[in-house]
């Protein structure tokens, strides 16, 4: 990895007035890794899983050159990278989702993403946005530091050691999982923290877990640490906490929040939190716990070790937090699903390689009649089981778990339109189509277009309208500078769906049946949606084609997505127009010449 800036310490002293271009080089290649003790070939950035930490300062411009060296025929060999949470003002072409904002980068080609960061600060991450490729390892953390952070006097340490990348891990390449048509294969084999974990079924002949298999954060008594926690998973949710220590939440998804002290918090795929931990306990070793809470009984752990403890590093004396998933959830995931259908379009194809709907896209087709009869009953059982489990955890351990609805933005709290009605209201009803096994929004299952949405808009010589997009592109045009409210609800089947909107942080003005909150609602870019639904608001002040999708990657593969074409005429011309360079324009002509095996 190449970087043109000085040390993080020096960066923290540089005011935004001295913003610079921060260069990185990404060699995306296949390589063998064993983060949980089981070796497999993966998709790596600079030979690492997770990929290297990207850091910059407020006001800097990130310039990241991606060199595609992928060669393993069992995995996708083209690639794209999405910079999750970066708003991409006037740089929608750099956002990364294949066939929304770009064509993929072919093997043996390179592409440089250039992204002015503007006023953004906080905790973000990057991942492949081509098919299910990030499942195979292409994911890593991003931190944008603020030299004038309002909370700077509340912590002493905030560096690469305190960044925690939580990730589920699969032993089988994602393409092979899709080809099996078996939903059980979408359950991860293990979980990791900063690329370290354990795979421990009793029947497996794998490495025994040792201290070296666990990530270790060393702390000094009396010091305060800003922990930045990222859920870079394909499906897994975690409950994160540090044994014997409280942590004060100050950031959610890149948005500073008013402080909330908790013992633990739930974090869904795509979400991020910062919390301040004070090392105020007896010098010893303590568990950092992050059990997976939604798909399998797996304890994911790291260690917090006091440097003041003069004894050799050892396991904590106290037991670690265990998690018991309800039998109803286990039954949901282990129900016999049978074979999978598809929408009649190949998984690899010319100039449409988000991979969206093949293979897993109908993983529940054969169980349709059975599950449709049981859906309401099952969903109720799942929700009841989870609620009872949360109650038991809180009562037994007196654990204070973050209530997401209580998050308040530190700067400019309040919905964009205040309490007045939104200018545009968009009802979005999602669910599973039992006839074909596809997830839908408003009865449409997303399929990527033959030409990237952004390219379509930029080359349209007439006014962009709905007729420019096919039905299964599921593209909705939004007018500029309006307050938009999305009413998102549907048939969640007892699962919490992490919904992510590109190009915006939004205000969650209502959770389920709770009273609406326009005064100080939570603000973030990933929100969990259940049957009860949510309502979110944002202002259309960032022209571009922005993806809305479930961040359970397998659900995105099954069509749980749509695109908002925001202010399309302003994308083409004016002060907020998007102006891709020559290398971007050449991606599609290079990609469309590839044989299917190299896509």
Swiss-Prot record:
It catalyses: 4 hydroquinone + O2 = 4 benzosemiquinone + 2 H2O. It comes from the Eukaryota. Its cofactor is Cu cation. Residues 21-145, 157-307, 450-567 form the Plastocyanin-like domain. SUPFAM superfamilies: Cupredoxins. Residues 1-19 form the signal peptide. GO terms for molecular function: copper ion binding; hydroquinone:oxygen oxidoreductase activity. Cu cation 4 binds at residues 497, 550, 555. Pfam families: Cu-oxidase (PF00394), Cu-oxidase_2 (PF07731), Cu-oxidase_3 (PF07732). One of its GO terms (biological process) is lignin catabolic process. Keywords: Copper, Disulfide bond, Glycoprotein, Lignin degradation, Metal-binding, Oxidoreductase, Repeat, Secreted, Signal. Binds 4 Cu cations per monomer. Glycans are attached at residues 207-208, 231, 397, 443. Cu cation 2 binds at residues 84, 127, 551. One of its GO terms (cellular component) is extracellular region. In mycelia, at a lower level than LCC4. Disulfide bonds join 103-588. InterPro entries: Cu-oxidase-like_N, Cu-oxidase_2nd, Cu-oxidase_C, Cu-oxidase_fam, Cu_oxidase_CS, Cupredoxin. Cu cation 3 binds at residues 129, 502, 549. Lignin degradation and detoxification of lignin-derived products. Belongs to the multicopper oxidase family. This is Laccase-2. It comes from Thanatephorus cucumeris. The gene is LCC2.
